[in-house]
């Protein structure tokens, strides 16, 4: 097997993401003619500790959202250092990119510039070996297909409606295979659309493909999902479970949780009561960002109360950052980390975060962003690290479906070796 192949050219360009904003795409050219390509996603609700996404700020072009400065950083600064490097030295290249930037949040070159290069390098290396990306990243034991954490109802900053919480999702943990899990989700999605139509609600969709109706309350979102699961022919709490992304940092103001659409302002303890009440009433298996990113005491409380029976995912809390994750582990908060490549900015740092989480007994959920492209790297990544869970939107909008379709291909390729862990993917809760 090859172990040395030089990078001969690096090209970055500005393309559009699924929200019609510019993003960075990078191509890496190798001496044998191989090309590797990667496109970078972008978030709507972002944690304050995320690596910095470099935007131009020129209001005359793309409302200030252009990424030409990030493109220039790749084509001029990064390319000069990268050309001549061995494409198989991923760790060395990522370290070089971090040092070239020189800041603790990648604000000089931009995490979008750095991530585009990091992922394109990995894709180029895999392509040169004629090897699937998941196999190149993860090795021979990469075989676990993920349980989808599928967004079917949107609220918060992902939709323009009356729901405070950001995402209501379904997880087919009772399915026997990934392909069956996807079918179950698709059927619930279509059933939910009919239910919403029959109730006179809009079936317009949000950034991630979930429906965004003007429901009367946050709880009504759970009720219509339970109805959809049943009418689709499945048992809630046995075959299909509910997951929530509360994105609570978005409505955390002056130390309180302000649920504007419900006209309620809650303390941390009351917010935990709010979720505990839901967990007792509904088959909720996972809550993401139930507490705000700076509410460490709230996180301690929700972990003490719910951490043995519900997956508590830190997204804004951890931002795929090993320093934040280490603090959380030391404090005993949450029991899972959401993995978003662009929160930290390189493949190596992402893999380090997953490894740290696994060592501490935390689950890892590999995730998309609300602004996505047709890039399917995260589908390969989730299999590469045997994470067992993926969050990549509804079975609608092609930038979301692209990831699911790639996972179907991987499942087919792995054939009898493919493993769908279902309920066992939640190994640290009862």
Swiss-Prot record:
Q: How is the cofactor bound?
A: Binds a second Mg(2+) ion via substrate during catalysis.
Keyword field contains Transferase: no
Q: GO CC terms for this protein?
A: cell surface; extracellular region; phosphopyruvate hydratase complex
Q: What is its EC number?
A: 4.2.1.11
For this UniProt record, give its keywords in alphabetical order, as a comma-separated list. Answer: Cytoplasm, Glycolysis, Lyase, Magnesium, Metal-binding, Secreted
Q: Which Gene3D superfamilies match?
A: Enolase-like C-terminal domain (3.20.20.120), Enolase-like, N-terminal domain (3.30.390.10)
Q: Which cofactor does it need?
A: Mg(2+)
| Catalytic-site annotation from UniProt | 208, 340
Q: Report the subcellular localization.
A: Cytoplasm; Secreted; Cell surface
**Which reaction does this chain catalyze?**
(2R)-2-phosphoglycerate = phosphoenolpyruvate + H2O
The protein's annotated pathway: Carbohydrate degradation; glycolysis; pyruvate from D-glyceraldehyde 3-phosphate: step 4/5
Q: Where does Mg(2+) bind?
A: 245, 288, 315
The entry sums up its family as follows: Belongs to the enolase family.
* Entry protein name: Enolase
Query: Lineage of the source organism?
Result: Bacteria, Bacillati, Bacillota, Clostridia, Eubacteriales
């Amino acid at each position: 097997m090859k172990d040395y192949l030089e990078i001969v050219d690096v090209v970055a360009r500005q393309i559009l993401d699924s929200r019609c904003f510019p993003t960075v795409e990078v191509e890496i050219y190798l001496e044998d003619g191989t090309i590797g390509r990667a496109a970078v996603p972008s978030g709507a609700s972002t944690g304050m500790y995320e690596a910095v996404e470099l935007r131009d700020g020129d209001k005359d072009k793309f409302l200030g959202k252009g990424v030409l400065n990030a493109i220039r950083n790749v084509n001029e600064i990064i390319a000069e250092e990268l050309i001549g490097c061995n494409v198989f030295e991923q760790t060395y290249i990522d370290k070089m990119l971090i040092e070239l930037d020189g800041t603790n949040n990648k604000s000089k070159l931009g995490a979008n510039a750095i991530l585009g290069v990091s992922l394109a390098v990995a894709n180029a290396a895999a392509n040169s070996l004629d090897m699937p990306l998941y196999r190149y990243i993860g090795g021979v034991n990469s075989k676990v297909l993920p349980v989808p954490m599928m967004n079917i109802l949107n609220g918060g900053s992902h939709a323009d409606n009356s729901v405070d919480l950001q995402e209501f999702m379904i997880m087919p943990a009772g399915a026997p295979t990934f392909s069956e899990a996807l079918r179950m989700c698709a059927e619930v999605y279509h059933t939910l659309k009919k239910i919403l139509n029959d109730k006179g609600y809009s079936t317009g969709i949000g950034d991630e493909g979930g429906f965004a109706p003007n429901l009367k309350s946050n709880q009504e979102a759970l009720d219509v999902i339970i109805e959809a699961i049943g009418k689709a022919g499945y048992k809630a709490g046995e075959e299909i479970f509910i997951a929530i992304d509360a994105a609570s940092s978005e409505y955390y103001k002056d130390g309180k949780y302000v649920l504007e659409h419900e006209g309620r302002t809650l303390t941390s303890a009351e917010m935990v009561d709010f979720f505990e009440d839901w967990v007792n009433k509904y088959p909720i298996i996972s809550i993401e960002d139930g507490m705000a990113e700076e509410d460490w005491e709230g996180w301690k409380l929700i972990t003490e109360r719910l951490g043995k029976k519900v997956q508590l995912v830190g997204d804004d809390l951890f931002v795929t950052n090993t320093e934040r994750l280490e603090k959380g582990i030391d404090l005993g908060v949450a029991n899972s980390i959401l993995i978003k490549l662009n929160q930290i900015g390189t493949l190596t740092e992402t893999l380090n975060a997953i490894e740290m989480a696994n060592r501490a007994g935390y689950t890892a959920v590999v995730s998309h962003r609300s602004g996505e492209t047709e890039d399917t790297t995260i589908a390969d990544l989730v299999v590469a690290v045997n994470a067992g869970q993926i969050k990549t939107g509804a079975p609608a909008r092609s930038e979301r479906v692209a990831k699911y379709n790639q996972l179907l291909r991987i499942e087919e390729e792995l054939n009898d070796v493919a493993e769908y862990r279902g309920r066992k993917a939640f190994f640290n809760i009862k």
